Regions:
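Solvent-exposed loop segments that connect transmembrane elements
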Residues: 1-4, 46-78, 116-156, 191-210, ...
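Transmembrane beta-barrel wall of Gram-negative outer-membrane proteins
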Residues: 3-43, 47, 63, 77-112, ...
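Residues that define the transmembrane beta-barrel architecture of outer-membrane proteins
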Residues: 15-19, 86-90, 97, 160-166, ...
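Membrane-embedded beta-strand positions in outer-membrane beta-barrel channels/transporters
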Residues: 20, 80, 91-93, 102, ...
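Residue-level signature of outer-membrane beta-barrel architecture
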Residues: 25, 96-98, 172-174, 225-226, ...
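Repeated loop/turn-to-beta-strand initiation elements of outer-membrane beta-barrel proteins
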Residues: 30-33, 100-105, 176-182, 229-235, ...
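Transmembrane beta-strands of outer-membrane beta-barrel pores
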Residues: 39-43, 98-102, 109-113, 186-190, ...
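Outer-membrane beta-barrel "beta-signal"
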Residues: 590-607
Length: 607
């Protein structure tokens, strides 16, 4: 086992080469054709890895050698993912624009090809245990054949796939004050990359590829109307049906238990209704209601394979205590806006939302698959684990805003927001609540008819309070300050120039405490270590552009971007000690990153 720091350096990087082409043509005064094509090649490598503990539920004895209680072996390897892929995107559409009716019909295609199908690691020699000592030293158990063999199993890389979408969208003006819009689309996505061609020869019998099929249908309709001079109405309805029609096969095994791959279908319905009325005293009031329903019906009635012996095997849910097939959320909004004078106006808004769902589904233990519907009382456990996307949630948010123009050339906007989410489930653990605050100011100043100056500043705080099932409480907080200043103008009739300077300061705080049921060892360790340090990020970015009009229908544009970033993140190392993998490989990230981008574009518009 070589000592860390004695090997060669490898700089992980990815190069992207992209070419895009687009054009448009007016066939008639009302009909236009548009087409775009983009080809992007990626080459290089990025950070990736593999880890395993042995024995475990998915690899019991005799696959993994049985060890004494609490003496499981585990290892973590750095395995850079080789990248050599091509993504092609093509879109073509017809646009018709009439006096009252406008419609667009189009096709969009995406084609992904990966020249690397699998990653095949090799473990040469010994590995370190979790304490950084060679396995087998100091009386510990040597590296077992079971763990070595599992670490050397091939790993699948992103497979070839493609998607085809046909869509139709448009709008129609019934009257000068009433307009409707709509969109219909159908997407057919497939994945048929061959297993054997990618180095996988021990798949299910008779199955040559995954045969993935995902069909998505989307329908949306909206209406805006002003039935009265003082009343405006908005209504929207959106429906999306995503059907995962991939075939099932017995891909997975835990000991002697077999189960299939999992498919995930989703139906999503969303609606919005809003009304705005002009009140006396320069007041304008808005009331709105939003509704969203998610139907994951396949979770409550999962597909399965009839094995011919009376058993029907499906996929297995593990690692969580329960899930839900359906959730629905209703939001209520109210806003009051007033123009105090020609120079100043302000608004206050409030949002309240509640989300709940169907009964909880408890995963069945192997060899059974699927889930069983149960009540909250039946599934309750003090340390139960429920994904937050299924948990009940109450949301309250208030927002203040103001617009002020003390002089014609100067405009200022002020914003302040405060919100809180509360989560609940049949457990005392998990995500409890989140909070957010945001304050911002934007400024725009016209130096002259040809020159404009802009500036802004935003400060935000986001917090998450999580009670972990293992006995600690995490109060996670992110503080972010963003400031920018820029200008744009025309020094000459044919020339446009501009510049923007952006500064970002971000700090993630990981405050940790032990709860009353934490072990004495964990309490002592937290007190000694002090918990996790903060993570900080700084970004200073300068953007410059210039555009020259060669002719009425052609331009040339030059962009220059210089970006300087600094990241202080303990994941990559702490106090000068880099992160160490089980084979003594170290990984590091240069905390100071400087990037310069230069782009030149030629723009031609067909008349």
């Amino acid at each position: 086992l070589p000592a860390f720091g004695t090997g060669s350096n490898l700089d992980l990087k990815t190069e992207r080469k992209a070419v895009s082409l687009g054009g448009e043509k007016w066939i008639t005064p009302n009909l236009m054709f548009e087409a775009t094509f983009k080809n992007e090649d990626k080459d290089g490598a990025r950070i990736f890895g593999k880890g395993f503990t042995c024995p475990s539920g998915v690899a019991p004895t005799p696959i993994c050698t049985a060890l004494a209680a609490g003496a499981n072996q585990w290892a973590l390897l750095l395995l850079p993912e080789p990248i050599n892929s091509t993504t092609r995107q093509f879109e073509a559409k017809l646009n018709y624009i009439g006096d009252k009716f406008a419609v667009t019909a189009g096709y969009y295609g995406s084609f992904y090809n990966n020249d690397n199908g699998s990653l095949n690691p090799m473990v040469v020699g010994n590995l370190n245990n979790p304490l950084g000592h060679p396995m087998g030293a100091d009386g510990s158990v040597p590296l077992t054949a079971g763990l070595r063999n599992i670490l050397q199993l091939p790993m699948a890389l992103p497979p070839d796939n493609q998607a085809h979408q046909f869509y139709l969208s448009g709008n129609y003006a019934f009257t000068p004050t009433t307009r409707a819009n709509f969109k219909l689309s159908y997407t057919h996505a497939t994945q048929h990359d061959n297993f054997a061609g990618n180095g996988f020869t021990d798949g299910p019998a008779g199955v040559n590829d995954y045969g993935g099929v995902l069909n998505t249908t989307l329908a949306q309709i909206g209406l805006t109307s002003r039935p009265m001079p003082k009343l405006s109405l908005i209504a929207n309805l959106r429906y999306e049906d995503r059907k995962d029609e991939s075939p099932l096969a017995l891909y997975n095994i835990e000991g002697a238990n077999r189960f299939t791959n999992g498919t995930y279908s989703l139906k999503k319905t969303a609606g919005k209704l809003e009304g705005t009325y002009q009140l006396p005293a320069n007041l304008r009031g808005t009331l709105g209601i939003d509704y969203e329903a998610l139907d994951r019906g396949q979770l409550s009635s999962p597909e399965c394979i009839d094995l011919g012996d009376g058993n029907c095997q499906g996929d297995s849910v593990a690692g969580i205590s329960g899930l839900r097939a359906k959730t629905h959320e209703t939001s209520y909004r109210a806003e009051l806006r007033r123009a105090m004078s020609e120079m100043f106006s302000g608004a206050i808004s409030y949002v309240h939302a509640e989300r709940d769902g169907s009964s909880w589904l408890k995963p069945n233990a192997l060899p059974a698959t699927g889930v069983t519907p149960v009540s909250d009382e039946a599934i309750f456990n003090r340390t139960a684990i429920f994904p937050f996307i299924f948990m009940d949630r109450k949301r309250d948010k208030v927002k203040l805003s103001a617009d002020w123009s003390p002089i014609d050339r100067l405009s200022l906007q002020f914003t302040g927001e405060d919100g809180k989410d509360k989560y609940s489930a049949p457990t005392t653990k998990g995500l409890r609540d989140t909070k957010m605050r945001l304050y911002g100011v934007d400024m725009s100043y016209a130096l002259s008819e040809a020159w404009k100056l802009t500036a802004y500043y935003t400060y935000s705080e986001q917090t998450l309070h999580v009670s972990h099932s293992t006995g600690y409480i995490a109060d996670l907080e992110d503080r972010n300050s963003t400031a920018g200043i820029g200008f744009s103008g025309k020094p000459m009739e044919r020339i446009d120039v501009g510049a923007d300077l952006l500064y970002i300061s971000d700090r993630n705080i990981y405050a940790q405490t032990a709860d009353q049921l934490a072990s004495a060892t964990n309490v002592a360790f937290l007190a000694q270590s002090g918990g996790l340090p903060d993570v900080t990020f700084r970004d200073l970015r300068l953007k410059l552009f210039g555009k020259y009009a060669l002719q009425k229908n052609s331009d040339i544009r030059v962009d220059l971007v210089h970006d300087r970033q600094r990241l202080n993140e303990w994941t990559w190392g702490f106090n000068g000690v880099p992160f160490l993998y089980s084979d003594n490989t170290t990984v590091g990230l240069n905390p100071n990153q400087n990037v310069t981008f230069v782009g030149v574009r030629y723009i031609y518009r067909w008349q």
